[in-house]
């Protein structure tokens, strides 16, 4: 038995060495690109920091090896690109070669990679057509009424906390806000704020899946079996159970405007399989709710850690509202909602602060990995066909190579032409975040409206809030206990 095990291990080692040194292999072609030296078989996998986030390791290596470097992920060859000029050359100037998302075996076993973020095959064009038809400027503007109504419900809850003056946990309320917006878009339903029991499992499920999705799954890169007890598998299946319940309870009508009905119509036409309906609902509810709530929470943390900036943002909002207010800004006698479609260009300092927040706190630190479809030369380096490609978003936006004082929150850096770099907080290229327009709308409207109504206060001002977050596929905001004062 021991001899058999030893023989298998030896065979695997020989296979991996042959594969890595085969002259046409991605690893061999990419070997001329600088990068960290890895271990036999494992490559650089064991050097990746799962605890603090893989993006922190990518940032460290960028400082050593520069804007283009190679990483050996077990038996897979990867290249990490940093800085907008380099990323643009790959994902915009050579868009077709860098367009597909990388197919992880672990993800394929979960849902056959059938959702919009992973699908590269025949269903991708059908899914993209569905999503783009629901995310036009006109359709998003129609969503504004739902966003306004949701903010009113949130404000009624926040008013009570303002009245009692006690510190409270802010995270769940913003998670509920985001889940309700995306649930209205997806299912045509929302949930009450009074009781978190109905959505607490959903909130936890979304958080657990995003954290697990940001960790390395060894079986994706080494010839070992995939485990159904892995955090990724168990968190995905737990969330799917909840999503399937919501899907089955949906009253399907062909004239429905919710996204689920559109997916069901395409399924009935034979354009997408049922697995794709479920997996896309899962992706929409997960990515759609998290990107908004986490980004908004990080913004409010920056406001409390920088109260002078919060005051400047508030004053800018007040001046703009006094000059531009109309009857339709009032949802009732006292509640004002500052809509994105009307106010996005009328509150300049808020726009600078939001841009700075997108820079400092990108929704996904390295996005979804891509795969090259052909051999391509970028900045003199030949990148092999079949190479896994990372957009190093976090290091791009938190490096002093591109921004002075990158760890500081400085809205003024976006004044004039001092920083002409293009933000890539939601990725870039033809496969960037498809829902970013809706996210921009939600985040602007909720931030402008709540800052106009409340001052957000750190109950322990001598201890600034931790703005690093919990690492994962997206960065989760840590539990944030605040006080608010009605203005």
From Swiss-Prot:
Membrane topology: Single-pass membrane protein
Cofactor field: heme
EC number: 1.14.-.-
Keywords, ordered alphabetically: Heme, Iron, Membrane, Metal-binding, Monooxygenase, Oxidoreductase, Transmembrane, Transmembrane helix
CC per GO annotation: membrane
Binding residue positions for heme: 433
Protein name: Probable cytochrome P450 513B1
Species name: Dictyostelium discoideum
Top-level taxon of origin: Eukaryota
Sequence similarity: Belongs to the cytochrome P450 family.
Family annotation (Gene3D superfamilies): Cytochrome P450
GO molecular function: heme binding; iron ion binding; monooxygenase activity; oxidoreductase activity, acting on paired donors, with incorporation or reduction of molecular oxygen
Transmembrane parts of this sequence: 1-18
Annotated PROSITE patterns: CYTOCHROME_P450
Keyword Heme: yes
InterPro entries with a match to the protein in the record: Cyt_P450 (IPR001128), Cyt_P450_CS (IPR017972), Cyt_P450_E_grp-I (IPR002401), Cyt_P450_sf (IPR036396)
């Amino acid at each position: 038995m021991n001899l058999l095990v030893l023989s298998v291990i030896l065979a695997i080692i020989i296979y991996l060495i042959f594969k890595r040194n085969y002259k046409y292999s991605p690893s061999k072609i990419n070997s001329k690109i600088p990068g960290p030296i890895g271990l036999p078989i494992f490559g650089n996998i064991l050097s990746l920091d799962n605890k603090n986030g893989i993006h922190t390791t990518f940032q460290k290596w960028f400082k050593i090896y520069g804007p283009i470097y190679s990483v050996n992920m077990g038996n897979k060859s990867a290249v990490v690109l940093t800085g907008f000029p380099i990323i643009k050359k790959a994902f915009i100037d050579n868009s077709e070669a860098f367009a597909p998302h990388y197919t992880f075996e672990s993800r394929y076993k979960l849902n056959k990679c059938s959702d919009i973020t992973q699908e590269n095959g025949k269903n991708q064009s059908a899914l993209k057509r569905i999503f783009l038809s629901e995310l036009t400027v006109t359709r998003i503007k129609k969503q504004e009424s739902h966003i306004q109504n949701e903010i009113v419900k949130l404000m009624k809850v926040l008013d009570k906390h303002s009245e009692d003056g006690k510190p409270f946990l802010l995270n769940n309320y913003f998670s509920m806000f985001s889940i309700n917006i995306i649930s209205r878009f997806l299912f045509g339903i929302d949930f009450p704020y009074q009781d978190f029991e109905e959505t607490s499992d959903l909130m936890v499920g979304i958080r657990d899946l995003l954290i697990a999705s940001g960790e390395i799954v060894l079986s994706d890169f080494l010839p070992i079996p995939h485990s159904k007890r892995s955090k990724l598998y168990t968190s995905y299946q737990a969330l799917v159970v909840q999503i399937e319940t919501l899907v089955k309870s949906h009253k399907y009508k062909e004239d429905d405007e919710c996204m689920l009905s559109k997916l069901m119509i395409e399924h009935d036409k034979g354009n997408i399989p049922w697995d794709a309906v479920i997996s896309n609902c899962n992706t929409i509810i997960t990515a759609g709710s998290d990107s908004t709530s986490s980004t908004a929470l990080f913004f409010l943390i920056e406001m409390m850690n920088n109260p002078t900036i919060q005051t400047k943002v508030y004053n800018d909002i007040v001046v703009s509202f006094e000059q531009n207010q109309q009857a339709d800004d009032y949802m009732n006698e006292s509640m004002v909602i500052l809509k994105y479609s009307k106010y996005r260009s009328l509150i300049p300092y808020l726009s600078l602060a939001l841009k700075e927040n997108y820079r400092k706190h990108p929704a996904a630190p390295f996005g979804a990995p891509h795969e090259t479809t052909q051999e391509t030369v970028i900045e003199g380096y030949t990148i092999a066909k079949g190479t896994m490609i990372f957009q190093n978003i976090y290091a791009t936006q938190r490096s002093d190579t591109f921004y002075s004082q990158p760890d500081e929150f400085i809205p003024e850096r976006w004044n004039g032409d001092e920083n002409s770099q293009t933000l890539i907080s939601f990725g870039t290229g033809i496969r960037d975040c498809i829902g970013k327009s809706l996210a921009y709308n939600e985040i602007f409207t909720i931030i402008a409206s709540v800052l106009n109504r409340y001052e957000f206060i750190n109950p322990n001002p001598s201890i600034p809030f931790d703005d690093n977050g919990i690492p994962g596929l997206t960065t989760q905001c840590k539990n944030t206990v605040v006080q608010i004062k009605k203005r």
